[in-house]
Amino acid sequence: MTLFHFGNCFSLAYFPYFITYKCSGLSEYNAFWRCVQAGATYLFVRLCKMLFLATFFPTWEGGAGVYDFVGEFMKATVDMADLLGLHLVMSRNAGKGEYKIMVAAMGWATAELIMSRCIPLWVGARGIEFDWKYIQMSFDSNISLVHYIAMAAVVWMFTRYDLPKSFRLPVAILLGLCVYKGFLMELFVHVFLLGSWTALLVKAVLTGAISLCSLFLFVTLVHSN
């Protein structure tokens, strides 16, 4: 039963990545090693972020239940390094915009999935007692995939030299939402005392809204050129 539960969680977490890779056409471009390189860039960026946070933002030692608003906001600002990393990956790949976006997003999201959720699923989902948090973790990995695709698309649009002036403000707002989405979610959970399933639903809705706006801007920009 525990192995069956682990199989369900593993399939729910990993198969959407495999399906996205196959259906997006990346397999036809032999982009596997490009995605691996993007994943390696993610690991380097994450290491730099961890060193920076450990050096300049030590562990919060405030009272129980006290939310360090300024500290968490500054920590979230460090996630701007992800924007630089995605831009670096896309600038090193030749091809159409959608190809660059998918390579960067797939490599980035897959590396995060392996580093953040592989071991917890392997250790926890095979436990004797059933726990919904591993199902939630699997759903969250799918949300992260959508998030990174949207983020890569926004970064690609923001770095275009021919970006129309009317697009600059919406794209900048989307960049800010991509960077501070995690901070906003933590703030919502703390203020409104959201449960785990409610927080996951809010995160999915917020990610979906950002993704739809990014898709609309991307399609409009591509067709206008």
Curated annotation (Swiss-Prot):
Q: How does it sit in the membrane?
A: Multi-pass membrane protein
Please indicate if the UniProt record lists Membrane as a keyword: yes
Q: Name one GO biological process term.
A: multi-pass transmembrane protein insertion into ER membrane
Listed A to Z, the keywords are: Cell membrane, Endoplasmic reticulum, Membrane, Transmembrane, Transmembrane helix
**What is the documented function of this protein?**
Component of the multi-pass translocon (MPT) complex that mediates insertion of multi-pass membrane proteins into the lipid bilayer of membranes. The MPT complex takes over after the SEC61 complex: following membrane insertion of the first few transmembrane segments of proteins by the SEC61 complex, the MPT complex occludes the lateral gate of the SEC61 complex to promote insertion of subsequent transmembrane regions.
Q: How does it assemble?
A: Component of the multi-pass translocon (MPT) complex.
Q: A single GO CC term, please?
A: nuclear membrane
Location(s), subcellular: Endoplasmic reticulum membrane; Cell membrane
- Can you tell me which family this protein belongs to? Belongs to the TMEM147 family.
Q: What is this protein called?
A: BOS complex subunit TMEM147
A GO molecular-function term, please? ribosome binding
Signal peptide range in chain numbering:
none
The residues on the Lumenal side of the membrane are 59-68, 127-131, 190-196
**Membrane side Cytoplasmic: which residues?**
22-34, 91-100, 158-166, 219-225
Name the Pfam families for this protein: DUF2053
Which residues span the membrane?
1-21, 35-58, 69-90, 101-126, 132-157, 167-189, 197-218
Species annotation: Danio rerio
Q: Which InterPro entries match?
A: TMEM147
